[in-house]
Every structure is written in C-alpha cells, then in structure tokens.
Design a protein with these regions (language model features):
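Tandem amphipathic alpha-helical repeat scaffolds
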Residues: 387, 423-437, 459-477, 498-516, ...
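C-terminal non-catalytic interaction modules
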Residues: 1-25, 639-699
Length: 699
C-alpha cells in the first residue's frame, strides 16, 4: 500500500522508518480473468485504438455476448496504461442509483469523508489524474451513469472512460461499439474454439472427441444454433459431461424448432440467449432449479453459509445446499472463485440471475427469500459489531468488505419492509461506516432509517451515535456536537451504561476537534476512570480512554496522556484488537514528540501505520504519515520529512479532508514539521521532495 521509506539520520534508531512509495507495479484494481480469452483479435485491436484516441467508449450488445470479457481483456496485461492507473467498477450488484458515486469512489480508492457531495469530490480528485475508468454493466443505471460520466469527463481532462452496457449512455462524444457474437463458420471459427475449450475445461477427456473426423461439423452446428453467443456456448459445453455432441445438437435443434413459429418481442439474439438459459434450466435437477431461483436475491458474490441460510427450506434442507450448489457450479450456472481474506465466493452472471428471479417470481417466493436474505445480513452485522473490538477484527474487516453489496441490498429491503430492523442494522454497522471508509453511504442509510423508524430505544440511540461518528469524519462538527448531546440524553434513559460511554466519547471528540480540549476531558475523563458501570471493559470505556488521552495531549499534559494511552494500548492488546490500539500508538507518538523523544515517537507512528494498513483506514494512514513527518523532521532528516508530507498530502486527498483533519493541535504539529524540514534543506529542495512523495501510490 505504501511500502517502506528509510530514514537517514545520525541516530541508530530504526524506528524512524516509514512508508516508501511502491515502484514497478501497475496501479489499479482489475479483477483476474476468470478463464482464458478466445478470439476477438480484430475487436481487441479496434478497441485498443479507440482507448488511445477517444475519451468515452461504450461496448453494447446482448447479455452473455462477452462485453465485460472483451473490456477486461483490452485493459489487462499492460495493453492500456495510465499514469494514475486503470480502475474497474463493477455495477452489476448495485441496485440503488443514489449509491453510484459511492461505488465509483470506493473502487478508485477515494474514501468518502468530505461533507461535499460525492460527485463534487470525485470530480476534484480526478481533476489532475490520468486514468482509465471502466464502468461494467451499466444498463440499469444509464441515466445516472450518463450524468456522472459527463461531470467527470468535463472536470478531468486526463480521464478515459470505458463502459459496458446493453444500451448506450447517449452522452455527447460517446463512441459506441457493438460487441457481436463470435463467428461460427468454418473449422477454425472463434465460436468453435470457445465451445471446444469450455467443454474440455468441464470434461477433459472431450479433447479427443473434438479431434475425431466429422465431429467438428456437429460442434459447428451447435455453435450455429446458439448464434455464437459465448455464455450460451459455455452452458452447452457444460452439458457435454452428460451428453454426446450429437445428442446436444439434436436436443438444441428440437428446442429451437419448437420456438421457430412462436411470436416474440425479443430480437433474435436476445431470444437465443434466453432460450439457451431456459434450456439449461430445464436440464437441471429440481433442487438445482429451486436453488437457482432463490440465489437470485443475492447481488454480487456470496459464500456458502449465506446460501445455506437464505436458500434452504421446504424440499431443500440446509444440509443439501452445498451439494446442490456444487451441481450448479458444474453446469456453469454459478461461478466459484477464491477471494483474498474472504474464502470461497459464488456469483451468477446477470443474464442467469435475471432468469432465476423470474422463476422465483413464478414460485411466489420473492418476498420470503428477500426477507431471509435481509435478516441474515442484519444478524451478520450485529455479530460483526460484537466482534469488532476483538481478535477477529481484521477478519471482520475483510468479511464485511466482501459483503458490501449484500449489506446494501439487505438495508434497502429492510427500509421498505422493517424500518426498525433497518435502524438496528445501520447502527450496528457503525464500524463499517466510520472505520472502513464508507462515511457518506453510512450517513445516508442512517438518516433514512432514523426517518422511518421510531425515535426511541436502544437501536435509535445507537444509530444517533453512529450518525455522529460519520459527521465527525466529515468535519461537520456542528452536527457532531448536536448529535453527541442528543445521544447523551437518549442514553441516560437506558439501563445499560454502554450507550452513555459511547455518547460521552462522541460528545468529547466533537468539542475537542475544534479546540476545546478542557471540555472534552471533562466529558470523557470521569467515564474513562469509572469504566463500564464500574467495570473497566467494553467498547465505550475504551473509546473514552482514547478521547481522554487525546485531550490530555492537546492540553500539553504529555506524561499523563502517555500513561492513559499505555493503559489503553495494553487493554486493546489483551483483546487482540488493532484499530483502537493503533490510535493509542498515535497518542503515544504525539506525547513522545511533546516530551522531546523523537525516535520513540517515530517508533509508535510506525506501529500505528501498520495497524491502519491492515484495516484500510485511510484517515488513520493520513494522520500517521503527517505525524511521522513531524518526528522525522525533529530527528533532522528534512528531505524524508518533506517526502512523507507529500505522501500524507496524497492520502489526505483520498479522504477528501484537509491535512490533520482540521484539528488545530494536529495541524500545528504538521506545520511544525514542515517548518523544520524547510529550515533543514531549503524551500526548493523541500518542494522537490514533497512532489516526489505526493506521487506515491495510495491504492
């Protein structure tokens, strides 16, 4: 993420080492190619030419024709490079158009901590970038994509956008390229090559069959029946586990002959694709068809535990879901992949998912299965809330990041069907909104849930607190203070002391950030000492200790601050917790700087950055880089301090906030480091080193 900077100073203290920009690796987030790419050399050449010459290219075509595969192939392997990377935005799981900007921001590594609209923030962030943005599967968001792409292209002259969609955006200057099915004629056709490869991948012994004299003509007939549509060919290839080529050709022929005289509003290729999917559906076992239908409520990928919980019932017991799911994978209806930190995941292509949803509607189960999906992810959110400040924190971060699309879908459903459950779920996800870079999105969900649900009780108080945290990170201190006061009043009505401690933390930080450390200490200090109803445990107590240590630093009481932070650090270490422990390291670093222990300060900042890196906490990384620069400047290495400040500047841009988050005391530390660095190496050398650091990667 930010590598390893080395420090050059006269002290032997290796603690004054921090991040070094990565080099030699391509920037971006391109997904791996799920299978080998067959054919389309002319299309690839044309598309690569357009990507060098035009700024907006849209690949159109029927579902299953290979738009996404062609786009991915065109931008991988160094075929397209940009100074600031190639970024892939998967829009297929997105159902709420209001979250389009948040989805794009998250994909490109822009955390949404600004109070400005995300459209504005994206435009400002991309203004000086040279990058290629791929928006994949836009047909259900055409109007919103047209608006956002127009704004981005106008604001960012170095931006190129590649879109895949079943229909064009209709934007000025858009270059539309229709992706056609693969050619089917001849023994060397692309369609035949793809059919053969997918069939052999499913059943390796078929390689010899395709080489037999006369079999190529039969395989070509299958390709013609399926119009050379790649997804249809893949589904047919999977059937060769059970049938010969000749049986497949005969059954397909019978299927299409039956439909030949049927009146339909579908254009031929759409009809071919839907017929091929329907044929695969008919050939599934009854339980496979049922699971296919129920899986259609998932948006994006999912794991087997979720499939078991959401899709079991009636004739499909939970104990059989995994085996039936494996059958759908074998038939190429469901795709299986391994995700780093998230284990085995499953997904369906949109065309297949849409067919399943139609079948689920026929079964009359849409509401029932959607309810089960929503309540499963609500329960997962509550479990993550309970486990966040514990040894499984990094695993929870990775798990919930992988489940982002499902969390959105569940919240949207609950907002319409069970607002109280939506409120509880949105509040339980406080750590996801606050710690994992989804502040705009979290604030929007929380505000919607609070408008829809009763304004009282534990769930409402928790939501107030979570909303206040999002306001804090957006720099909306007026709202944060107001919410802190309201949360304190609501918490006092509850029997549980935990909400009172959380409210005290929110209120304290909300008054401390603008500069009132004395009041912050008065709010958090007594609760940090008293603990959780007399017990020194629980998240609220830990947070109050953090606020207390911050306030003591701001008041210049560095020894007391260090003592408080050490106690917090030890408590977090006992829990196996990383997020708060990293902030304890941050306070220890600030206190060490105040006490003149510059090497010790650098050591603590490095520990802090290590923890924040594990959890993708961009705000924390930005804070840490500026503080490390101050420590390094105090140690006498002005050049490295300038580079670190430049890198910190790049990270602050990814959170859309001013450096040091706007806090007067923290800004003063950063400014002191800059003055010392300039004094050590001069303004010209400082600016050069700063620019070098600012070019560091933040992906």
């Amino acid at each position: 993420m930010f590598g390893e900077y080395s420090v050059n100073n006269n002290q032997s203290d290796s603690a004054a080492r921090g991040p070094r920009p990565d080099s030699g690796s391509a920037l971006g987030n391109l997904p791996p190619e799920s299978a080998s790419f067959v054919g389309r050399e002319p299309e690839l050449g044309h598309l690569n030419h357009l990507l060098r010459e035009r700024r907006l290219i849209t690949l159109t075509g029927v579902g299953g024709v290979g738009k996404s595969r062609l786009a991915l192939r065109a931008v991988t392997g160094g075929r397209q490079t940009r100074r600031d990377g190639v970024w892939w935005v998967e829009l297929s799981p997105l159902r709420d158009p209001a979250l389009l900007s948040a989805t794009v921001a998250h994909a490109v590594g822009l955390a949404d901590h600004s109070a400005r609209s995300l459209d504005e923030e994206l435009c400002a962030w991309m203004a000086d970038k040279e990058l290629l943005l791929v928006l994949d599967t836009c047909e259900h968001l055409v109007t919103e994509c047209r608006h956002l792409v127009g704004e981005l292209l106008q604001s960012a002259p170095g931006l190129t956008v590649l879109v895949t969609s079943r229909e064009p955006l209709g934007s000025p200057g858009e270059q539309v390229v229709e992706v056609r099915p693969l050619p089917c004629e001849g023994p060397d056709s692309d369609a035949l090559a793809l059919f053969r490869e997918r069939a052999v991948a499913a059943t390796p012994q078929l390689a010899a069959v395709f080489d037999e004299p006369g079999r190529a003509a039969v395989a070509t007939e299958v390709c013609r029946w399926l119009d050379g549509i790649p997804l249809a060919l893949e589904l047919a290839g999977a059937r060769l586990r059970l049938w010969t080529l000749e049986q497949t050709a005969r059954r397909l022929g019978a299927r299409f002959d039956m439909l030949a005289d049927t009146r339909t509003a579908l254009v031929p290729r759409h009809q071919t694709m839907r017929t091929a999917v329907g044929w695969s559906h008919e050939l599934c076992e009854p339980l496979e068809r049922l699971l296919w239908a129920r899986l259609s409520v998932f948006t994006g990928d999912f794991d087997v535990g979720a499939a078991r919980a959401v899709c079991s019932g009636g004739p499909l017991p939970a104990s059989r879901v995994e085996r039936v799911l494996a059958g759908l994978v074998a038939k190429s209806v469901v795709r299986r992949s391994e995700a780093r930190g998230a284990g085995t995941r499953y997904t369906m292509l949109d065309t297949i998912r849409e067919f399943g949803l139609d079948w689920l509607t026929e079964l009359g189960e849409v509401r029932t299965v959607a309810d089960r999906h929503a309540h499963w992810y609500a329960a997962l959110s509550r479990a993550a809330d309970r486990g966040w400040l514990g040894p499984g924190q990094v695993d929870w971060y990775r798990r919930m990041t992988a489940e982002h699309a499902q969390l959105r879908t569940a919240l949207e459903h609950l907002l319409g069907s069970d607002p109280t459950a939506a409120l509880e779920m949105a509040g339980a996800l406080w750590f996801f909104w606050f710690s994992c870079g989804h502040v705009h999105e979290g604030r929007a969900f929380l505000e919607r849930a609070m408008r829809a649900a009763p304004c009282t009780g534990t769930a409402y108080t928790q939501a107030l607190w979570a909303l206040g945290l999002t306001a804090l990170l957006q720099g909306d201190m007026e709202a944060a203070q107001r919410l802190g006061e309201e949360c304190t009043r609501e918490a006092a009505r509850l029997a549980d002391p935990e909400p009172e401690l959380r409210a005290a933390y929110l209120h304290a930080v909300a008054v401390m950030m603008p500069g009132d450390a004395a009041r912050a200490l008065a709010l958090a200090g007594p609760r940090a000492r008293a603990g959780h109803g007399g017990r020194t445990s629980g998240p609220g107590w830990l947070l109050c200790r953090l606020a207390t240590s911050y306030a003591l630093c701001d008041l210049g009481r560095f020894e007391e601050a260090a003592e408080e932070a050490r106690g917090l650090h030890e408590a977090c270490a006992e829990l196996g917790e990383r997020w708060l422990r990293a902030y304890a390291d941050y306070v220890l670093a600030v206190a060490a700087l105040g006490l003149g222990e510059h090497g010790e300060a650098a050591r603590h900042v490095r520990a802090m950055l290590s923890g924040k890196r594990l959890l993708g906490d961009r705000f924390g990384i930005a804070l840490g880089l500026d503080l490390l620069a101050a420590a390094v400047a105090a140690l006498g290495d002005g050049e490295l301090a300038a580079r670190l400040l430049g890198t910190g500047h790049a990270w602050w841009r990814t959170v859309g906030r001013p450096q040091m988050g706007g806090s007067p005391s923290l800004t003063a530390l950063r400014d002191q480091g800059e003055r010392q660095a300039r004094a050590a190496i001069g303004d010209a050398a400082y600016e050069s080193a700063f620019r070098g650091g600012a070019a560091a990667t933040t992906g």
